[in-house]
């Protein structure tokens, strides 16, 4: 098969391909005892799942299910869901949104794909416009979303702040950060996937000032952030203005299978997003919107996130963090990024004698799936690879699994890391 240039970009093997295949294998394999410590699949929390069971039963009972699956939805999203979301965000965040500020897509991944290729890439004037990531590493799912290849993305290496002997935090290096004439937008996830980092309110305010002054939008991937699902372990102030594009998702509230993404932006951007949704898929999936709307309207969703979802992930993070000194000890140079949100730990093994890709392969051979960290540095120039080994020394761990599987999986990782250092 002969692929077009765009086909070549979209089918190139990247980290997200391995991630999704490993995720499916670990979750659905008949092989017992596999440790799925990769991927962003949320935990199955009974109290949350019960909400969706009740909502689905009501849709079947009142006859709305037939319309839900038998008719196309509006290409911009379900009007009732959008009205409920706008009302909720305005009340909780003090914003002044209108329905014209919201569009629904087939998941947060598709929202970012649409926005990236709508704003950046080759332009009529011959310029290739870029998406700038002010703090790398960032979400591996962005890596293959460009229709013109890696030229669309540029990233900034972070500053590393040591907090104690085994804990560090990435910070934006504003001395390195430059918004250029070809910069189409500045983008980051907050809380950050893969590290669990939360860019501080002060850093965010500075980014907002810089992007507003440059006349380019600031995109925030809010898949884990406030006010929903609010998987944050430090205070985080929700932020939006007309120079910002905020993306959200229903995945992390327990509905990844419904593929429901949300874009919040000024009306001209929303109209363009809706046009691209219509062209690419006619309309977004309406199941997730229908399941969630009643709980948005009556406050149940916010309460369950506050009382059940966020505390669950905080406990999981604390349990996983407590395992690290026990399993890794003091014989090897291990560090973990400060866990401030999301559902991951980001481990750094300074001077690791093997690459993180080889560590991933060794763990996988023993039934433990992790994510090699170098994929998350996709936006950094290749020429920086040699002088900065850090990006080959990190792995991402998901802590959504049971305590037994977390202990088993992290024990495998610790064993393989110790072997690597001892054989160097």
PLM regions with names:
Residues 1-76, 80, 87-91, 181-182, ...:
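N-terminal "arm"/small-domain region of PLP-dependent enzymes with the aminotransferase-like
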Residues 40-44, 109-111, 138-141, 191-194, ...:
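Short, solvent-exposed loop/turn segments at secondary-structure junctions
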Residues 61, 66-214, 219-240, 245, ...:
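Conserved core of the PLP fold type I
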Residues 83, 87, 91, 95-96, ...:
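PLP-dependent enzyme catalytic core of the Aspartate aminotransferase-like
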Residues 127-131, 146-147, 156-162, 240-314, ...:
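Conserved core segment of the aminotransferase class I/II
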Residues 332-367, 375:
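Conserved PLP-binding catalytic core of the aspartate aminotransferase-like
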